């Protein structure tokens, strides 16, 4: 006894389509029924666990160059959007050509936890230039640089991430860059970013924290060398 005869769903809609074609029906009617069956199967098909996920390397740079509104947060390192070439080399990223932070109508909001100012890749000799770069970009039109003080972190920052418009999110792991495009996931990361944004200080207060870190770097490097 077949599944069709017992009223149980078959796994492939083409099985039902073949039954329609075996009946002596008008060709147009067969195609109409087949179309309805395929639509019904599509609506009830289980969502793939990897739907809306991409592992293509370099996707973040491309997204950042095309997006009008970019939000980035890092917990323990300088956000990649703001890297200098020297910082990138010390971090083992090779040649680095980040997206332009200027452009009419483009907005960037970049947050970093206070500890990120003190994480030194390599010998740390890249840090004075990197911290100086943070001060420079914080004054660019269309760029908001925020520092989340250590004592007010709204939640444990498990990893850094970047949100591009309301279209995609990139997350970097030790082994790969993950791009998420599912609507719910992009919305969730947007809400998480808003929490860090509310906790961060901006403008002169943020620059004061960066300048404090720069003084610490100079003193420490002077002591080492």
Regions found by a protein language model. Name each.
Residues 3-120, 202, 206-225:
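Interdomain hinge/linker segments and adjacent boundary elements that couple functional modules
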Residues 73-105, 117-225:
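Amphipathic alpha-helical interface segments
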């Amino acid at each position: 006894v077949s599944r069709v005869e017992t009223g149980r769903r078959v796994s492939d809609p083409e099985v039902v389509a073949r039954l329609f074609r075996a009946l002596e029906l008008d060709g147009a009617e067969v195609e109409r029924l087949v179309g309805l069956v395929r639509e019904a199967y599509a609506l009830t098909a289980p969502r793939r666990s990897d739907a809306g996920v991409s592992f293509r390397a370099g996707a973040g740079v491309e997204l950042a160059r095309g997006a009008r509104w970019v939000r980035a947060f890092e917990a323990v390192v300088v956000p990649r959007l703001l890297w200098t070439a020297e910082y990138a080399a010390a971090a083992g990223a090779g040649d680095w050509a980040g997206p332009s932070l200027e452009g009419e109508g483009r907005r960037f909001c970049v947050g970093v936890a206070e500890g990120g100012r003190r994480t030194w890749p390599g010998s740390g000799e890249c840090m004075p230039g990197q911290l100086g770069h943070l001060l420079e970009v914080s004054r660019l039109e269309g760029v908001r640089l925020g520092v989340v003080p250590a004592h007010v972190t709204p939640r444990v920052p498990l990893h850094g991430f970047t949100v591009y418009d309301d279209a995609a999110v990139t997350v970097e792991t030790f082994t790969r860059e993950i791009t998420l495009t599912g609507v719910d996931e992009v919305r969730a990361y947007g809400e998480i970013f808003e929490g860090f944004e509310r906790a961060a200080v901006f403008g002169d207060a943020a620059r004061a924290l960066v300048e404090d870190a720069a003084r610490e770097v100079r003193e420490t490097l002077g002591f080492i060398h």
